[in-house]
Structures are given as C-alpha cells and as structure tokens.
Amino acid sequence: MKKKGRWIPVIGCLMLVLFLAGCGKTIDIQSTAEQEIPSQNQIVVGVSQLGSESMWRTANSASIQQALCKENGYFLLFNNARQKQENQIKAIRSYISQRVDYIVFSPIVEDGWETVLQEAKEADIPVIVMDRNVSCDPSLYTAWVGSDFTEEGRNAARWLEEDLKGKKFDQKETVHIVVLRGTSNASATLGRTKGFAEIAKTHPNWEILDSDDADFTTAKGREVMEKYLQKYKDIDVVVSPVSYTHLRAHETRRHL
C-alpha cells in the first residue's frame, strides 16, 4: 500500500475538513467496515477519531469521510474511539499492521502516544495529528493540522472585555465567572484555559468562581452547570468551549 511523497494532498484535505466542519451534517458517524479491498491507485488512510462528543465533532467526522472518499482517490478506514485513548491506540496499531499509506488521528489527550507513534515511525508510515495536539517528540509525526487553542482562549476573553464595555459594566464591580472546561488534559482544554486566564488576570474585578471539566458533552456540561447554580447565587458569565454546551447551560439555568 505504500505510496511515497503524497502527504501534501492529504494535509490539504484535512485543512479543508477543519474549515468546513462547522457547516457539516450532524449525522451519527460510525466506524467503517474493513471488508472492501483498495485498488492499486488509491491512497489508503486510516483515521482514528476520538469520538462524537459534540455537534462540531460529528460534523468534523462527516467532513473527513466526504473529503477522503473514493471519488477523490482515497480508501478510508475510519474508527470512532468513543472517548477512550486505548481504543485510539488499538486502532492505530491495526492501521500499522495493515500497512496503510497514512495514519490520521485526533488525540483525546496530549500524553501517552510515544510508544504507538514510535511503532508507526518504525513502520515508515506518516502520521498526521488533526485538531488537538500531542505532547511528545515532534519527529514521531509528520504534521499537525489544527488551531491555536491558546489564542482562542485569549479571543474569548477579549470578546468579554468588549461586551462588558458595551454594556457599560462598572469596572469596579466584580464580574463573577464560571468555566465549563473540555476534556481533562486535552490540548484544546489546556490551551483555551491558559489563553483566557492570561487576559483574565489583567482584570482585578474578574473573579473566576469555579472551573471544572465538562468533557465537551451536553450531559456533562449540564451536570457541571447545575452544580455551579446550586453552589453560587451570583453568576454573571459562563465560559464554555462548546457553544452547544453553553446553550444547554442556559437551559439548565431556566429550569432551576
């Protein structure tokens, strides 16, 4: 299956996938069957998606399947890891044993990938990390295609700055903030939390009452928000990494 020197088109497809994910269909993405046999001229790509925890992730998975399709010259092996790192590692090892041309994965957490990525490197299979990032030797993967999560956190704080100014909020009055984080130790969670905190600390009147993991899911986001509303009487701002979770958090507030 090995086809050298063709990783740039794959990265280009993945960049388009991330750009279009927000516009994708919200369908349930399952792991693809491995019964078909690829033709000699197809590029075989094994993808390990971390799960389907949000509308964005589901759209992202749909975009991957649309971009890496047979009509575009690809043979796609797709695995939904269902929020478990061990499932991702198992899928990657399966792709290595099948001698795919490329491995693409969106890591659920940053750490714990060194061994399996070393195995892929020794098998001479290029690995492309998508969306979230990994914390390991960069030589173990070919490229990372994703966003600057720290800057996303800063942008959220900057938006809050402008919103408070527009509402003529008294700069001496305390702004009570609660944070619904994503998955613990995920690069998206770490980066956005860091970026928001950088700007928040320049505002002495911004008080972060609490911050807890909501796993990028509606159910967990609602659970954490219910806890906040029972614990704190005065909440001015909810910071959430996923707009859908944020909307459900407001729904919870109406119910209490």
What are these language model-derived features?
Residues 47, 100-107, 126-130, 179, ...:
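Periplasmic-binding protein-like
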Residues 45, 88, 145-174, 220-222:
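Hydrophobic alpha-helical segments within soluble ligand-binding/sensing domains
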Residues 115-151, 170-176:
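Flexible loop/hinge segments that line or gate small-molecule binding clefts
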Residues 21-22:
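C-terminal motif of bacterial Sec signal peptides marking the signal peptidase cleavage site
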Residues 44-63, 67, 71, 77-90, ...:
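Extracytoplasmic "Venus flytrap"
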Residues 56-70, 152-156, 187-206, 220, ...:
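Short, solvent-exposed amphipathic alpha-helices that sit
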Residues 245-255:
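Conserved small/polar residues in nucleotide/adenosyl-binding loops
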Residues 78-80, 136-162, 179, 211:
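Short beta-strand elements at the ligand-binding edges of bilobed clamshell
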